From Swiss-Prot:
SUPFAM superfamilies: Ribosomal protein S5 domain 2-like (SSF54211), UBC-like (SSF54495)
Parts of the chain that traverse the membrane: none
CDD domains assigned to the protein according to its UniProt record, in alphabetical order: RWD_IMPACT (cd23821)
Organism in which the protein naturally occurs: Caenorhabditis elegans
Name of the protein in question: Protein IMPACT homolog
Swiss-Prot/TrEMBL keywords: Cytoplasm, Differentiation, Neurogenesis, Repressor, Stress response, Translation regulation
Keyword Transmembrane helix assigned: no
High-level lineage: Eukaryota, Metazoa, Ecdysozoa, Nematoda, Chromadorea
Gene name per UniProt: impt-1
Chief location bin: cytoplasm
Function per UniProt: Translational regulator that ensures constant high levels of translation under amino acid starvation. Plays a role as a negative regulator of the gcn-2 kinase activity; impairs gcn-1-mediated gcn-2 activation, and hence gcn-2-mediated eIF-2-alpha phosphorylation and subsequent down-regulation of protein synthesis in amino acid-starved cells. Plays a role in differentiation of neuronal cells by stimulating neurite outgrowth.
One Gene Ontology term of the molecular function aspect: protein sequestering activity
One Gene Ontology term, aspect cellular component: cytoplasm
């Protein structure tokens, strides 16, 4: 069988075996949602499984760093043991076993739609972070945060402040995009980047929107607290709408004449 035929067969098999876990599927990407708010996005290269490994991204707001490292290393070990063969079934089984073995102290997340916070905790907010309205859809909650940034140090500082807030730190995803300008020898240098944090493809859409709006020297983070019900493409619409709204509310983008 060709790589493409093996991928198609594997995807069909996974959809029939794990229908409750498989949130999204295309011929190049699979998105799984597990208990304990653990998510796994898997991207399939064109030469998988014969040559390249699938690329995975994990999200787990309730996992400690060392727990994530154990899971990450275990997934890599499973691939090494199965080089050249379909491996995703083994990966999903491993994640399920990992979750079953988690201690009870890793609690099930509670719905936070009515408990999303705006004040900062622990870290002093010296970046004047602004917070948008909370949007809820089928028990998931979304909230945008915005700050002016003019360096990578500013970007890192904003993230530290946001994640010092317990609720924001425990969001299922904190999707981030930023743009800022510096000068070298009088020439403007544009800097930009984005981070999906497990919500694959969401941050690049945010950055594209910021580019279209010509929003410079600004960073937007959209927090999503997953409520247990799959939203499909609607979640991308919510993330983009909140990004646009908080930028407009804070006078970023083209100025109206």
């Amino acid at each position: 069988m060709s790589d493409e035929e093996q991928r198609i067969a594997e995807i069909e098999s996974l959809a029939s075996i794990f229908p409750d876990l498989l949130e999204e599927t295309t011929d190049k990407q699979l998105v799984f949602k597990f208990d304990r708010d653990i998510g796994m996005t898997i991207n399939l290269p064109e030469d998988y499984p014969s040559i390249s490994p699938p690329i995975f991204e994990l999200s787990g707001p309730y996992l400690r760093r060392e727990q994530k490292e154990v899971l990450h290393n275990s997934l890599n070990d499973v691939y090494i043991e199965n080089i050249g063969f379909p491996v995703i079934f083994n990966w999903i089984s491993l994640v399920q076993d990992f979750i079953r073995d988690l201690p009870e102290e890793v609690a099930e997340p509670s719905h936070v739609a009515d408990d999303v916070v705006t004040p900062m905790a622990e870290e002093i907010d010296d970046m004047n972070i602004r917070h948008g309205e909370v949007l809820t859809d089928r028990k998931s909650a979304f909230q945008a945060h915005l700050a002016e940034v003019r360096s990578k140090e500013d970007v890192d500082r904003v993230m530290r402040i946001l994640k010092s807030n317990t609720k924001i730190c425990r969001a299922t995803h904190n999707i981030t995009a930023y743009r800022y300008m510096t000068e070298i020898n009088g020439k403007p240098i544009h800097h930009h980047d984005c981070v999906d944090d497990g919500e694959f493809g969401a941050s690049s859409k945010m950055l594209e929107l910021m580019d279209r709006m010509k929003a410079d020297n600004v960073m937007v983070v959209v927090s999503r607290w997953y409520g247990g019900i799959h939203l499909g493409p609607d979640r991308f619409r919510h993330i983009n709408n909140l990004t646009r709204q908080i930028l407009s509310d804070n006078n970023y983008g083209p100025k109206k004449s």
